[in-house]
């Protein structure tokens, strides 16, 4: 990674204005159901406190549409942060985001203390990246730290705009994400295998196109595999399919051949007569999918083939489930991929789980800690895999 990080700053007596990603899931009572994103920010916050800084944290939560909404207040996050960060001398919260009240709260901060600003999306200027809001935020710190990889693909006032008004560096989480995903894409240990799943090919065209020039093998699963099977002239019954994307699938298969990348499709599938955990189900070869049935998972021969590819790889990136993993009978393929990746990692391969549903699948399987890296950013991971420059990263100072 060619950007400055928090290690490049002398923090003694400085105020660190840190964009974190505290966009955590809440239940109906406003209780946090998964604090992974809060925990992911702790190494950066701890480092800053240990090195004599006071820390001002900003984040969005949910989609409050540019106005205050108690449902999306960061109050529960502050309470959880207080529990997770006993070494902070104090964790304070302000109802303000910018302006005199926020500036007064920051002026009271002493080294070793933490202040959490209210949800940045309560301000209608946040998402349009209004320079006036960015300049107001910049008054709250001496150095801007971006540790919110999950929003690095969005040019908001608190992720990109503020970096034009303060020295800007990456936090440890941002650095880790860019080092793992960027390293795998730009300088992979080979064989380099990617596993791409999920429902729609249209969501992942850019990813597949970018990867075809880099990978040794691309393993396709999930609903998008049906569109590839249809493009090969196979009948997919009542399966989820995108007829409009058939020409794209044909182009991608041709491009894979041109570039010497092996694009592997399922050879057998688990089909059901309804979209339900209680449906009748059977395993068939992809050439034998009957009318009225739908593909809901990859089959055992495909699992064996894909698992062997993963275990033989030195770098693996996975994005998207292999089937309808939220229905227990159709989670087998997705779990098997997670297991094969854990085995590859145990043998010294770099294994990266790239955001979204794959992360949930790996966590459900209890294998998250067996991976080299589990990404915290769904959309941001996808854009990196597409080869795009992330605005929140581009705005940081280059390493010298």
From Swiss-Prot:
It holds the Pfam family PGK. Keywords: ATP-binding, Cytoplasm, Glycolysis, Kinase, Nucleotide-binding, Transferase. It is found in: Cytoplasm. One of its GO terms (cellular component) is cytosol. Its EC number is 2.7.2.3. Disulfide bonds: none annotated. It is an enzyme of class 2 (transferase). InterPro entries: Phosphoglycerate_kinase, Phosphoglycerate_kinase_N, Phosphoglycerate_kinase_sf. Substrate binds at residues 21-23, 37, 60-63, 121, 154. It catalyses: (2R)-3-phosphoglycerate + ATP = (2R)-3-phospho-glyceroyl phosphate + ADP. GO terms for biological process: gluconeogenesis; glycolytic process. Pathway: Carbohydrate degradation; glycolysis; pyruvate from D-glyceraldehyde 3-phosphate: step 2/5. Its main location: cytoplasm. ATP binds at residues 204, 326, 355-358. It comes from the Bacteria. Monomer. Belongs to the phosphoglycerate kinase family. This is Phosphoglycerate kinase. It comes from Chloroflexus aurantiacus (strain ATCC 29366 / DSM 635 / J-10-fl).
